[in-house]
């Protein structure tokens, strides 16, 4: 184990929207250090949303999608006397954001549209409208926490 807690590295806001969450999203989207490809996919998806949405702005849809997918509660395994319990715990804000980004990207990759740009745009629109696979994942996570509320006293 490390002696001290690792310092949180500050990310630069993205050049177009000046938003740090978009930078984090691009970094999570990136494969093999190809940031320019990830950036192209992200901005392309936001432009696609701008074109589709009419009065909807891509950045607003993005922010709504992240907010809708952020989990409030999750379960963590805790071993007590030979039995493993799923203990519900609150999710810290930084982890909420990280999980929301991770879920949106992973479920966008599993979609059936042709390009990643289209997949991401569709998943962001679905998440902003409180539907889609990433939103369902959040709901399932919350249901698991609710179902295991009886073990909440095992929290540490």
Swiss-Prot record:
Which BP terms does GO give this entry?
translation
Q: Which InterPro entries match?
A: Ribosomal_uS7 (IPR000235), Ribosomal_uS7_bac/org-type (IPR005717), Ribosomal_uS7_CS (IPR020606), Ribosomal_uS7_dom (IPR023798), Ribosomal_uS7_dom_sf (IPR036823)
The cellular component terms of Gene Ontology attached to this UniProt record, alphabetical and capped at eight, are: small ribosomal subunit
Task: Look up keyword rRNA-binding and say if it applies.
Answer: yes
Give one GO molecular function term.
tRNA binding
CDD domains annotated for this entry?
Answer: uS7_Bacteria
Supply the alphabetized keyword list: Ribonucleoprotein, Ribosomal protein, RNA-binding, rRNA-binding, tRNA-binding
The record's annotation in Pfam families points to:
Ribosomal_S7 (PF00177)
Query: Function, please?
Result: One of the primary rRNA binding proteins, it binds directly to 16S rRNA where it nucleates assembly of the head domain of the 30S subunit. Is located at the subunit interface close to the decoding center, probably blocks exit of the E-site tRNA.
Which proteins does it associate with, and in what oligomeric form?
Part of the 30S ribosomal subunit. Contacts proteins S9 and S11.
Sequence similarity = Belongs to the universal ribosomal protein uS7 family.
Q: What is this protein called?
A: Small ribosomal subunit protein uS7
Q: Specify the species.
A: Campylobacter fetus subsp. fetus (strain 82-40)
The record's gene field reads rpsG
């Amino acid at each position: 184990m490390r002696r001290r807690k690792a310092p949180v590295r500050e990310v630069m806001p993205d050049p177009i929207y000046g938003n740090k969450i978009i930078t984090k999203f691009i970094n999570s989207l990136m494969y093999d250090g190809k940031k320019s490809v990830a950036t192209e996919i992200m901005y392309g998806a936001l432009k696609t949303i701008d074109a589709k949405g009419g009065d909807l702005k891509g950045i607003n849809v993005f922010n709504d999608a992240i907010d809708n997918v952020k989990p409030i509660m999750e379960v963590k395994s805790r071993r007590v006397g030979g039995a493993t319990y799923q203990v519900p715990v609150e999710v810290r804000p930084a982890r909420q954001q990280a999980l929301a980004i991770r879920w949106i990207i992973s479920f966008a990759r599993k979609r059936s549209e042709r390009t990643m740009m289209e997949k991401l745009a569709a998943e962001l629109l679905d998440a902003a409208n409180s539907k889609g696979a990433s939103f369902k994942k959040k709901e399932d996570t919350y249901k698991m926490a609710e179902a295991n509320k009886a073990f909440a006293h095992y929290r540490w």
